[in-house]
Amino acid sequence: MKPDDCLNNIHIETENLDEVDLTKLTGEAHSLSNGIVPPFTDKTFRKATSFKQKCATYVLALRPWSFSASLIPVALGTAIAYRSGGSLDLLLFVVCAVAVLAVHGAGNLVNTYYDFSKGIDHKKSDDRTLVDHILEPQDVVRFGVFLYTLGCLCAACLYFISKLKLEHLALIYFGGLSSSFLYTGGIGFKYVALGDLVILITFGPLAVMFAHAVQVGYLAVTPLLYAVPLALSTEAILHSNNTRDMESDRQAGIVTLAILVGPMFSYMLYNLLVFLPYLIFSILATRYTISMALPLLTIPLAFSLERQFRSQNFNKIPQRTAKLNLLVGLFYVFGIVLAPAGSLP
């Protein structure tokens, strides 16, 4: 064989290899142009999407629309401390808010777990986290334990960065934590018509006193009095929820205040809880400072809720009542912050 023939053979083989490689590359490019994602990319995308959906599911299980009931008392207690002392520690406020939110969220999960275990939640319930198998019971338990642990860690941080005595901090914080669990777990205050009392105390005076004490370093009675209108507004959220679920709760064999008093008195009680705070704000505005009249701006929404409740259209009424609670609370906090020094009792 001549040297030229060898060179020709080598050239031909090289061309064949190039043809194979080009065919493979062309095929892969064609697949990508048709939207076919390589396997490793598809798996990564699915994992990322699944993680986002899981996070969204956990957030929804917390019922975030109800968090105004715990955030506003913390803001109110902090505002009272600021108005009385003239100083505000933002770090204390943030840690306190996270601690209270963690306990509130954990309490919501405990409520979800026990309502499902007792057969109270069903396909038409507002909370179908476990009914629709969005989460498994063990997922709810683990998430609840995590939130209670987070709350305790925040309480420990407050001990080191606040001047409040340990016994006072533990008394208020663990009192609130116990209430959030025993509302449906353990004793189950919700099931024996005592849930309204627990909510009235925990998400009113107790939370406001806790936030105030963390800022000033001691316990005081004054925040308890300021907490009354906010506590009534917060209780209206629970009462509207219990009135809506009256029939299903009765069939499940549990007793709530709404069941005890009946539809007519439930309507009257709801009006009392919604409108009595406005009377208190009017008295504060006329006797002390006009800034206390700010919450009166929400009266149109209150009358809208009254009409909806009277027509027995309970669709989304707990959420709308929570919105009213948020607005009333925010205007109340602004009213205290804007009040002239020494004008408040």
Curated annotation (Swiss-Prot):
It catalyses: menadiol + (2E,6E,10E)-geranylgeranyl diphosphate = menaquinol-4 + diphosphate; all-trans-decaprenyl diphosphate + 4-hydroxybenzoate = 4-hydroxy-3-(all-trans-decaprenyl)benzoate + diphosphate. InterPro entries: UbiA_prenyltransferase, UbiA_sf, UBIAD1. Its main location: endoplasmic reticulum. It is found in: Endoplasmic reticulum membrane; Golgi apparatus membrane; Mitochondrion membrane. Keywords: Endoplasmic reticulum, Golgi apparatus, Membrane, Menaquinone biosynthesis, Mitochondrion, Prenyltransferase, Transferase, Transmembrane, Transmembrane helix, Ubiquinone biosynthesis. Pathway: Quinol/quinone metabolism; menaquinone biosynthesis; Cofactor biosynthesis; ubiquinone biosynthesis. GO terms for biological process: circulatory system development; endothelial cell development; menaquinone biosynthetic process; ubiquinone biosynthetic process; vitamin K biosynthetic process. One of its GO terms (cellular component) is endoplasmic reticulum membrane. CDD domains: PT_UbiA_UBIAD1 (cd13962). It is a multi-pass membrane protein. The chain crosses the membrane at residues 60-80, 90-110, 141-161, 169-189, 213-233, 251-273, 285-305, 324-344. GO terms for molecular function: antioxidant activity; prenyltransferase activity. Its EC number is 2.5.1.-, 2.5.1.39. Prenyltransferase that mediates the formation of menaquinone-4 (MK-4) and coenzyme Q10. MK-4 is a vitamin K2 isoform required for endothelial cell development. Mediates the conversion of phylloquinone (PK) into MK-4, probably by cleaving the side chain of phylloquinone (PK) to release 2-methyl-1,4-naphthoquinone (menadione; K3) and then prenylating it with geranylgeranyl pyrophosphate (GGPP) to form MK-4. Belongs to the UbiA prenyltransferase family. PANTHER family: 1,4-DIHYDROXY-2-NAPHTHOATE OCTAPRENYLTRANSFERASE, UBIA PRENYLTRANSFERASE DOMAIN-CONTAINING PROTEIN 1. This is UbiA prenyltransferase domain-containing protein 1. It comes from Xenopus tropicalis (Western clawed frog). The lineage of its organism: Eukaryota, Metazoa, Chordata, Craniata, Vertebrata.
